[in-house]
């Protein structure tokens, strides 16, 4: 049985750990509130640009643009959004496991059939260790990234599609459902074959021409899909870390309660033993 000193040391150590996890939970909760606002505030912009693109696509059937046209798929590109830091429950492992399984099933790990663009240090390290074909990466993004932080990568991804480096582009990330629920999501970024909206489209007059507008607008729309997924993923990351730290804090408190009970029992046993020895000694003197 552990000594009173050992039990007391474990209690103090666990209390310090619980203080750290509690602080991390509070920090993550604060970051989550801002990340939620960032993700929500970007949605109207993304919806409006989709509306304009849909209006052009539906109103001008003769327009031919490479980003709108499907082509035979010989190679597929994947954008994978993960985090730079851990301690976020299954946030990274869920999306990485999904992507790994998809690539094994669809491409049998043949690097000539796929390529990966990865965001986040943990995702990069995981995929590199397992021999996946990574062609671009971004690490060190802030907890609240701006569009500028991701624009270069998104532009490169779109340019590679236009240059024929791959024939379709998917993005994988954790979609934020609620503070306790996030789900791995796959979205097709390119080609933009489903830009049509179910909502009634507004009639626009375009100057100089619809074709010229699309040349500018389509890359911006594709970039907005990447950025929107990143904001969504960041909200999921903070939510997952907050939940993980709360669970760790709760577990630590349970351990402290159990150790405190063991400490009290051990101390009671020690006191009982001392009393027994005193009584026994007194009886021997009589």
From Swiss-Prot:
The gene is atpG. NCBIfam families: ATPsyn_F1gamma. F-type ATPases have 2 components, CF(1) - the catalytic core - and CF(0) - the membrane proton channel. CF(1) has five subunits: alpha(3), beta(3), gamma(1), delta(1), epsilon(1). CF(0) has three main subunits: a, b and c. HAMAP family: ATP_synth_gamma_bact. Signal peptide: none annotated. GO terms for cellular component: plasma membrane; proton-transporting ATP synthase complex. It is a peripheral membrane protein. One of its GO terms (biological process) is proton motive force-driven ATP synthesis. It is found in: Cell membrane. InterPro entries: ATP_synth_F1_ATPase_gsu, ATP_synth_F1_gsu, ATP_synth_F1_gsu_CS. Pfam families: ATP-synt. Produces ATP from ADP in the presence of a proton gradient across the membrane. The gamma chain is believed to be important in regulating ATPase activity and the flow of protons through the CF(0) complex. This is ATP synthase gamma chain. One of its GO terms (molecular function) is proton-transporting ATP synthase activity, rotational mechanism. Keywords: ATP synthesis, Cell membrane, CF(1), Hydrogen ion transport, Ion transport, Membrane, Transport. The lineage of its organism: Bacteria, Bacillati, Bacillota, Bacilli, Bacillales. Its main location: membrane. Belongs to the ATPase gamma chain family.
């Amino acid at each position: 049985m552990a000594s009173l000193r050992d039990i007391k040391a474990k209690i103090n150590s666990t209390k310090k750990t619980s203080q750290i996890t509690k602080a991390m939970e509070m920090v993550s909760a604060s970051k989550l509130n801002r990340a939620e606002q960032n993700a929500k505030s970007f949605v109207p912009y993304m919806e409006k640009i989709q509306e304009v693109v849909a209006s052009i696509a539906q109103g001008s059937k003769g327009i031919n643009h490479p980003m709108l046209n499907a082509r035979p798929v010989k190679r597929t590109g994947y954008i994978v959004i993960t985090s730079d830091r851990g301690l976020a429950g299954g946030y990274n492992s869920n999306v990485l496991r999904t992507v790994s399984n998809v690539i094994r099933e669809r491409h049998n790990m043949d690097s000539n059939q796929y390529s990966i663009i990865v965001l986040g240090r943990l995702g990069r390290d995981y995929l590199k260790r397992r021999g996946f074909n990574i062609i671009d990466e971004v690490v060190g993004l802030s907890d609240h990234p701006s569009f500028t932080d991701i624009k270069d990568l998104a532009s490169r991804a779109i340019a590679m599609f236009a240059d024929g480096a791959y024939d379709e582009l998917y993005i994988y990330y954790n979609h934020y459902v609620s503070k306790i629920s996030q789900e791995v999501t796959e979205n097709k970024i390119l080609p933009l074959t489903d830009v049509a909206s179910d909502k009634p489209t507004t009639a626009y007059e375009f100057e100089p021409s619809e074709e010229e507008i699309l040349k500018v607008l389509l890359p911006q729309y594709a970039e907005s899909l990447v950025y929107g997924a990143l904001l969504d993923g960041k909200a999921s990351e903070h939510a997952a870390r907050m939940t993980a730290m709360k669970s760790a804090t709760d577990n630590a408190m349970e351990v402290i309660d159990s150790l405190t009970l063991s400490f009290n029992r051990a101390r009671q046993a020690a006191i009982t033993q001392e009393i027994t020895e005193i009584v026994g000694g007194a009886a021997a003197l009589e």
